[in-house]
């Protein structure tokens, strides 16, 4: 069996890696071991399961400092042969949301793999054999733009359907910031 592409969880207690060892779902799967008293020695590898692994090859995992797991697979429908996927980390050991493919231009119609983020930043690097490169597999850097949302909202009385004025709403963000809005005479937030 082959083993490669190790990545550590943010707390350094879980090591995820790719391997073609028996007991997987496809060619190469993502497996993990847990540290016992700060050591991985003697830990028995466990498969990450079918929510992450496919009948194809699942490789190049990267555990981000926020708990999100990134990896590449050719076992899910995407833009190319090998695409980068993400499963957002959830509370609990090895708990992840439904995987989703990263959009273009991070994924392309070619092989895209081995993404790595800088700690605490929305930037990093990945490898691709896409057209326009300098060789077979090239490194590409990226910086994700900040998310911006535009919204328009109205507040109405549930029973009468009439707009409510003077209602105060607080919109809270994941980063702890918040904005306070008050409705006008038409019930619109301003």
What is the role of each PLM region?
Residues 1-154, 158-171, 179-186:
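Short, conserved micro-motifs composed of acidic
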